[in-house]
Swiss-Prot record:
Keywords, alphabetical: Calcium, Calcium channel, Calcium transport, Coiled coil, Endoplasmic reticulum, Ion channel, Ion transport, Membrane, Transmembrane, Transmembrane helix, Transport
Predominant localisation class: endoplasmic reticulum
Protein name: Calcium load-activated calcium channel homolog
Domain of life: Eukaryota
Stretches in topological domain Cytoplasmic: 31-88, 165-186
Length: 186
């Protein structure tokens, strides 16, 4: 019985990820606004990479000053374009979030207090609350639906986005903690 429950949770996770990506495609990815924004980000990123490569090859101080200004201008445009693209995705994310919360609530009622599987390890402290949620007892190798659903949904949704080509653009601006190239070399 436990194997069927795990397979059911996996199936629901895959189906919900596909459905959420379908909703995202309908509301966002097929629109001209999104396609223009993504093309603009790609174009700006190529320009920025080209300028950074040229700057590293340039030795003249006056040329570097001009290039620095151009780089700053393009980085600012890239930041604005990323912001606009994120804003256009907002309605889709809202619809997906509501549907995922409803689905999770439904699954939580079905599997309330049910041990779905046994883990071959004891999860570290902060994961025990997720892996042992709604399960009575102190055996932390017992696993609830919440843990399996959360892990599968995160993994499956990211992979579906990669397969469908709807993953967020990978820009240097995406990591707010990344150091600029100048500061890394010092």
């Amino acid at each position: 019985m436990a194997a069927l429950e795990v397979l059911f949770i996996l199936f629901v996770s895959i189906a919900s990820s596909l459905a959420s990506e379908g909703v995202s495609w309908l509301l966002v990815y097929r629109t001209e606004n999104y396609k223009r924004g993504k093309a603009n980000i790609d174009r700006l990123q190529i320009q920025l990479d080209k300028l950074v490569d040229q700057e590293s090859e340039t030795s003249s101080l006056s040329k570097k000053g001009n290039k620095d200004k151009k780089i700053e201008k393009i980085e600012e445009q890239l930041k604005i374009a990323n912001k606009e693209l994120s804003f256009s995705k907002m309605k889709s994310m809202f619809a997906v979030a509501i549907s995922m919360i409803a689905l999770f609530s439904y699954l939580n009622r079905i599997f309330d207090g049910v041990v779905v599987c046994k883990l071959p390890f004891v999860p570290i402290g902060f994961l025990q609350g997720i892996s042992h949620r709604t399960i009575a007892g102190d055996d932390y190798t017992d696993c609830s639906m919440t843990f399996i659903y959360a892990i599968c949904s995160m993994f499956i949704r990211n992979n579906i986005q990669l397969i469908l080509g709807t993953a967020p653009p990978k820009t240097k601006q995406a990591n707010p903690w990344a150091l600029p190239e100048e500061k890394k070399t010092r």
